[in-house]
């Protein structure tokens, strides 16, 4: 006998729609509230999602760190290159 999966499908669709609305609400300053963050946290907990378990991609961070060093070498303490200073004068 095959199980009816319509309830599971419905609950997944409901959960997805709720998550999409929460994500949209994060972009709306008037809707961002402690209650919204609490609801998002409960949704993540329900799915056993923990931000602490996320590992940063070393390759991306390494690239950003390298780019920052290159930038610092090209600009002075004021954040301007020699060309920038010349065009501002």
From Swiss-Prot:
Region ranges (Helix-turn-helix (HTH)): 1-48
One GO MF term attached to the UniProt entry: DNA binding
InterPro entries in the cross-refs: DNA_matur_Phage_T7-like (IPR024345)
Coiled-coil features, chain-numbered ranges: none
KW DNA-binding (keyword) present: yes
Entry keyword annotation includes DNA-binding: yes
Keywords associated with the record: DNA-binding, Viral genome packaging, Viral release from host cell
Source taxon at top rank: Viruses
Membrane-spanning segments: none
Subunit structure and binding partners: Homooctamer. Interacts with the terminase large subunit gp19; the active complex is probably heterooligomeric.
Purpose of the protein: Plays a role in packaging a single copy of genome into the prohead. The terminase is composed of two subunits (a large and a small) and the small subunit recognizes a specific sequence in the viral DNA. Once the DNA is packaged, the terminase detaches from the connector and the tail replaces it to finish maturation of the virion. Packaging initiates by TerS recognizing the packaging sequence in the viral DNA. The nuclease activity of TerL cuts the viral DNA and the terminase-DNA complex binds to the portal of a procapsid shell.
Protein family membership: Belongs to the terminase small subunit family.
Domain remarks in the Swiss-Prot or TrEMBL record: The N-terminus contains a helix-turn-helix (HTH) doamin that is involved in viral DNA binding.
Name the UniProt record assigns to this protein: Terminase, small subunit gp18
Species annotation: Escherichia phage T7
Lineage: Viruses, Duplodnaviria, Heunggongvirae, Uroviricota, Caudoviricetes
